Amino acid sequence: STLLDTLKKYGNTCPVMISSSTQAALDNPYGESKRAGEQLLFEYSRETGAKVLVYRFPNVFGKWCRPNYNSAVATFCNNIAHDQPIRVNDPSVVMHLVYIDDVVDELISALSGREHRNGDYCEVPVVHTITLGGIVELIRSFRQMPGTLSVPDLSDAFTKKLYSTYLSYLPEERFSYPLKMNVDDRGSFTEIIRTSDRGQFSVNISKPGVTKGQHWHHTKNEKFVVVSGHGLIQLRKIGTEEVVSFEVSGGRMEVVEMIPGYTHNIVNLSETEDLVTFMWCNECFDPARPDTYSEKV
């Protein structure tokens, strides 16, 4: 009321925004206090003609929210990231949430007169609905991902936002996690990321003069990108004699496709430097079904 009285005193009819809550609809002291603040703005608008924007925000989540206070998402992210216990009284409770970046986008739009309205109230147009149990299940899956080299399904907008939120609560000692390097006298092969529907991402290192590969696949396919060193990639269609060759280097990166039905290899042409190759494969390696058959190019 002090702000509104001051604006009226000086005849300033600039727009006024208030951050309220969906709990303003509840019949409890907190809800009553929120409704009282809203009504002050609506009365001020009727009296002065000034534009008012009343946002009833649902649960807001995102990085830097204080855990163990009034945000279940912040508490769950923080405690699970730190291997601390959580309590879920009723996992079937339905939550309506808005992401902090979406809130900021809406308020920036409101500054330009492009707010989203629903009757007397303004709103953030992107609201995510999920059960409390569903949130916990997702966050717990995030905690396990470094051990399985997996990543979330980022095609789902809420999962993408929740994963970013979860990462912001990681203790610093978990910013990094080790990878298993499969090392032999030829170099190494290291899986980085494994996905259920987008294949596998790996790094291959070949020592000077080493040839790797010399095999083909029925269905499995790969993309090779040399990021350091100087090498030769060769492919030959099974049952034919013609060899297709690509001289590659980290100085001019390019993708070379490993085509199903073509035996292929990769040769480190350097006598002194390792050949470092980023590799994508359309499926994660399954030792029970390797789909890999030895044959020299």
Question: What is each of the regions a protein language model found here?
Answer:
Residues 2-36, 45-48, 53:
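Conserved Rossmann-fold NAD(P)-dependent oxidoreductase catalytic core, especially the SDR/UDP-sugar
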Residues 39-64, 84-90:
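Conserved beta-loop-beta element that borders a ligand/cofactor-binding pocket
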Residues 58, 78-98, 117-118, 123-124:
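A conserved pocket-lining segment of Rossmann-fold NAD(P)-dependent short-chain dehydrogenase/reductase
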Residues 65-75, 92-112, 133-137:
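Substrate-positioning beta->alpha
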Residues 109-180:
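Mid/C-terminal beta-alpha module of Rossmann-like enzyme folds, strongest
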Residues 173-214, 220:
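A short glycine-rich, His/Asp/Glu-containing loop-to-beta-strand
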Residues 237-262:
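Short acidic-glycine-tyrosine-enriched beta hairpin
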